[in-house]
Amino acid sequence: MDEQLLSDDEIKELTKDNDGVENAEEIILTREERDALGEIGNISIGTSATTLYTLLRNKVKITTPNVSITTINSLKNMYPFPFIAVEVSYTKGLSGSNLMIIKEKDAKIIADLMMGGDGTNVDVELDDMRMSAVGEAMNQMMGSAATSLSTMLKKDINISPPELTRINFATDSLKGYFKEDETIVNVSFKMEVGDLLNSEIMQLMPIEFAKYLVEHLYDLSETAPAQENNMDSNIQK
């Protein structure tokens, strides 16, 4: 089965089938809001490539994200195979959480590299030791992302240690995270690790949290011109 993430057209079609609303993405999130989420993702997750390079000893490339609207049911229908779900909760600066989803086979490559291998020993189960190795990589990655986000939003932001869970979309639900038919935001990134991994990761978040992030960015944008005007006024005096 093709493991590429959903295209915009596929998501729109699936969303239309689920709730009977055409152009659902524009209704739920405006183009400006999606652009803002893309900018946030690009600066926060995108800049963590340097951190991963240090950990994995391979060149890491994370591309500009694609922001789309989907549901868990839609994802389950398209990707009936194992993933590792990485839950990240904000403990300071922001209120909420999001879920990073990586394919299990990609997690095995990361685990092998973290444990000193060359990334090819992937015909193994993700036992506690390997899951811990993946967790450390995700902790460093999301910590770097939080630092970048803190700089971007000009406020202190802290996160809790990521919690990892193995999820098989063919048989499991994301109970405790999202409802099966809940409309959510999917911020997807293409990630390359040397010649070993050419895949994608998904950052899933509730609509409310996505809008919450955008509001923080908008508030910052509105504050900056006001501060500049005050400085100009003081200079003229």
Annotate the PLM regions.
Residues D2-K12, K16-D17, E26, T30, ...:
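Composition-driven recognition of glycine/serine/threonine/acidic- and proline-rich low-complexity segments
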